[in-house]
């Protein structure tokens, strides 16, 4: 039996809508990363962008377990003495709360050029509105998949 390798013409990308309200961040990010890579498909090929286009709404209403909301996130500006930090709670209450979800998904993907290409298929919105109604995305309900996915 020959090994199957997908061709670019064989790849079918769907649009998936995920409502992040009440969903635990790490569980959301791991499912989104799997969908972006295309590992949920039987025709998965590791060196090709096979994943779906994923839309995440209500990113500002995600849940964090334990004391992670008060844990600082560090980054460096690139300038001398440019180490900065903010807690995850401060970022969620700030101007761009969707960055928490984006960074969690980005860090669950491998670090190569293909992962950067796959990250362009992720769209994260803080509110419930999104401009992708024309693509008629399929709704993926994470809350009903596993009771551990939600937090009250």
From Swiss-Prot:
UniProt superkingdom: Bacteria
Record's GO cellular component terms: cytosolic large ribosomal subunit
Keyword hit for Translocase: no
Recorded GO MF terms: mRNA binding; structural constituent of ribosome
Keywords annotated in UniProt: Ribonucleoprotein, Ribosomal protein
Region (Disordered): 130-152
Keyword Ribosomal protein applies: yes
GO biological process: negative regulation of translation; translation
HAMAP family: Ribosomal_uL13
Name of the featured protein: Large ribosomal subunit protein uL13
Gene: rplM
């Amino acid at each position: 039996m020959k090994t199957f390798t997908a061709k670019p013409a064989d790849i079918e990308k769907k649009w998936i809508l995920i409502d992040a309200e009440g969903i635990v961040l790490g569980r959301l990010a791991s499912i989104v990363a799997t969908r972006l890579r295309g590992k949920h498909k039987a025709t998965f090929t590791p060196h090709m962008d096979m994943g779906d286009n994923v839309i995440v709404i209500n990113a500002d209403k995600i849940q964090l377990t334990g004391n992670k909301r008060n844990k600082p996130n560090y980054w460096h500006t690139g300038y001398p003495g440019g180490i900065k930090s903010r807690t995850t709670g401060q970022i969620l209450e700030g101007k761009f709360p969707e960055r928490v979800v984006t960074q969690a998904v980005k860090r669950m993907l491998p670090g190569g050029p293909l992962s950067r290409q796959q990250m362009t298929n992720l769209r994260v919105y803080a509110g419930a509105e999104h401009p992708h109604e024309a693509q008629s995305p399929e709704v993926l309900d994470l809350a009903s998949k596993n009771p551990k996915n939600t937090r009250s």
